[in-house]
């Protein structure tokens, strides 16, 4: 429900900007395109090759206590049921921390060796 509230507030802000009288001519199309470009960049999904397995990465925004966080998820459906999860203030940090969480869990479950885990944990 919080995501819907934030989306509603963003839409209301754009509508308000469009209908408020402006002292000069504004380029509304450029403004809306810029806002939508920034908002759509918050979500990200990708497929990666991880130690010979096809894995997925997903990042999505989340608001908690009026602060923007990025939740990351890393999983390999054809290999294991484990998932790496994270919540950070950094977009790139969320995917990196989710990958590290997955590597830690895979190491604990003896799916990978310590040497191969160290290569991913240092990077």
Curated annotation (Swiss-Prot):
One Pfam assignment: Anti-LPS-SCYG
InterPro entries: Anti-LPS_factor/Scygonadin, Anti-LPS_factor/Scygonadin_sf
Function (record text): Binds to bacterial LPS and may specifically inhibit the LPS-mediated activation of the hemolymph coagulation. It has a strong antibacterial effect especially on the growth of Gram-negative bacteria.
Chief subcellular location: secreted
Gene3D superfamilies: 3.30.160.320
UniProt key word Secreted: yes
Induction comment: By injection with lipopolysaccharide. Expression is highest at 3 hours post-injection, decreases to basal levels at 12 hours post-injection and is up-regulated again at 24 hours post-injection. In the presence of recombinant ALF, the expression is significantly down-regulated at 3 hours and 6 hours post-injection.
Protein name from the UniProt record: Anti-lipopolysaccharide factor
Tissue occurrence: Strong expression in hemocytes, heart and muscle, with weaker expression detected in gills and hepatopancreas. No expression detected in eyes.
Organism the protein comes from: Scylla serrata
